[in-house]
Amino acid sequence: MIKIKLTHPDCMPKIGSEDAAGMDLRAFFGTNPAADLRAIAPGKSLMIDTGVAVEIPRGWFGLVVPRSSLGKRHLMIANTAGVIDSDYRGTIKMNLYNYGSEMQTLENFERLCQLVVLPHYSTHNFKIVDELEETIRGEGGFGSSGSK
């Protein structure tokens, strides 16, 4: 179970369907009506609070990714995704970057990104070795597996 703490009731994440992989996170600019809109100029970024803090079970992590509609507006998460560790208790933030040529206006409580919760392999369970086990792919990197 994931516990969710809200800064404001309207920050409640939205789950789009029964089989949705993530929950939509909203922009939270505060409760002052004068602060209901924010703009991001072309080539600039804006750190946005979601008003949501989570308690993710140990062995899992949250991944903040853009909603597909952000691309239509030429907005992206500045570092492409955000990792929320299970021991983090602060509010989740989204750093959005405007890679377009027009000013983009955001509304208070607008759904912008989504939080997907995934299991992870412990980063404390590793061993330094001199050689790795051989595979058919080997060291083939970008494009090595073909495109068709």
From Swiss-Prot:
Q: Which cofactors must be present for this protein to function? A: Mg(2+)
Q: Which InterPro entries match?
A: dUTPase, dUTPase-like, dUTPase-like_sf, dUTPase_trimeric
The answer to keyword Hydrolase applying to this record is yes
| Record Pfam families | dUTPase
Its induction note reads: Expressed in the early phase of the viral replicative cycle.
Catalyzed reactions per annotation:
dUTP + H2O = dUMP + diphosphate + H(+)
The protein's GO terms of the molecular function aspect are: dUTP diphosphatase activity; magnesium ion binding
Task: Kindly give the Gene3D superfamilies that the UniProt entry links to this protein.
Answer: 2.70.40.10
GO BP annotations, alphabetical order:
dUMP biosynthetic process; dUTP catabolic process
Q: Which UniProt keywords apply?
A: Early protein, Hydrolase, Magnesium, Metal-binding, Nucleotide metabolism
* Entries under PANTHER family matching the protein: DEOXYURIDINE 5'-TRIPHOSPHATE NUCLEOTIDOHYDROLASE
Return the similarity comment. Answer: Belongs to the dUTPase family.
Q: What is this protein called?
A: Deoxyuridine 5'-triphosphate nucleotidohydrolase
Organism of this sequence: Escherichia phage T5
